[in-house]
Amino acid sequence: MVEVEEVSNKMQAQMRLHPAAAAEEEDADLPLPALFDKASHLHSLASSSSLDQEGIRKGVDLLRRCDEMVSKLGLFSSNETKDDVSTANLKYLLVPYYLGEMTERVAQEDRIPVLKASQDHLKEFISICEALELISEDELELSRQKQPDTMANRRAQKVARFKRQKAAETKLLEIKERKERRRRSLRAAALSAPIEAGEEDAFEDDGEEEREAWLATISLALCKAFDLLDMLKKEEEMLLAVKERQAKDGNAFAREMLDERTKKAEAWHHNAANRAPYSKPADPITCATFAQDVIEGRASVSQAHEHKHQPLIFGPASLVGGGLTSERERMAAQVFQPSYRLPTMSIEEAGLREMKMMEKWQERTAKMIQESNSAWHKDGSRSAQEDEDAEEEKARAWDDWKDDNPRGAGNKKLTPCG
């Protein structure tokens, strides 16, 4: 609790540094409903991530004032149940929940006190709801049972919580649609005819619907509070573990890492300086140079040449302008690659491939022209003409034979009486 008070004092001191603190002091005389309306509006803005740190701190201050006023007025007691709480006071049960959510969003260098303060507010909200019998029996049984923290148990709790959260959201949506339908019907009735004495009962349902809406909102807030409390506990455990490790050997470990990196950098620069005067590479023969030689006749396509496609280099190596002299630099350059697929060949390689294809087509075309002009091709055309003449002579001979031998001429010898 001492850390919670320290966080509260720090946030109050930071709030006084802003010009809006004077306006907040002027709002100190506002009644509880007005303060709650302002604070809930800021909470809704913070939930939609449309509120800066100044607005978050202002909302925390307003919610803290609401919490103090609720405590002074004694609106809730541990001896009461939810049926004993009036409908107008149900919404003030959400003050510690809103305060826990808003406190968790406060940006601070040391986050552990913020997490503890947020957890305290959420636990206060859960304890008040438990005293008023607002928590479901299933949730109470899960929290009371000391089961091992396994993945199956956590999954079962999350599934049950999600179902209750979905039911609360559905209930709120139904109440909203019901109110909208009643508003439209009353508006239409007022335009058509005045409301009679028997129709005034329609207004009496507003109080019951408002109570149902606030109870559903509290049920939804409870589901979110349990999930947020689990998340804050895990975050606090992680931060405490990191802080403990840093306090134990964090400085020594960081110093060793820096010394090792410094030694490697110095050794790399020393080797590069010694290697520079003697290891200047010759200008490589690129694919573009080889393609120009092929076009101008100084080289042939079949000549041995390694057409290696070097991919584009992104990242520090390309910015510095140096070559990749070590395996580490090549691996680092491969990290800074674009999101799209790189080409598999260069323009020069594609041009050389097209040149090879064109040469093959030219050779094939020349061969076909040579075959068409060859002697065997011409002889083949003359033999085809002779074949046509032979077919014509054969057809004429067949016609002559049919004239000499009419149909059925030789069958008389086969008859019995012939």
Swiss-Prot record:
Please list the residue ranges that the record marks as compositionally biased, kind Basic and acidic residues: 376-385, 393-406
Query: Which parts of the sequence are annotated with region: Disordered?
Result: 367-418
Cysteines joined through disulfide linkages: none
Q: Name one GO molecular function term.
A: protein phosphatase 2A binding
Source organism superkingdom: Eukaryota
List the Pfam families: TAP42
Q: Name one GO biological process term.
A: regulation of dephosphorylation
Q: Output the InterPro entries linked to this UniProt entry.
A: TAP42/TAP46-like_sf, TAP46-like
Q: Which GO terms describe its cellular component?
A: cytosol
Q: Which PANTHER family match?
A: IMMUNOGLOBULIN-BINDING PROTEIN 1
Q: Which family does it belong to?
A: Belongs to the IGBP1/TAP42 family.
Q: What does this protein do?
A: Involved in the regulation of the TOR signaling pathway. Seems to act as a regulator of PP2A catalytic activity.
- Protein name as it appears in the record: PP2A regulatory subunit TAP46
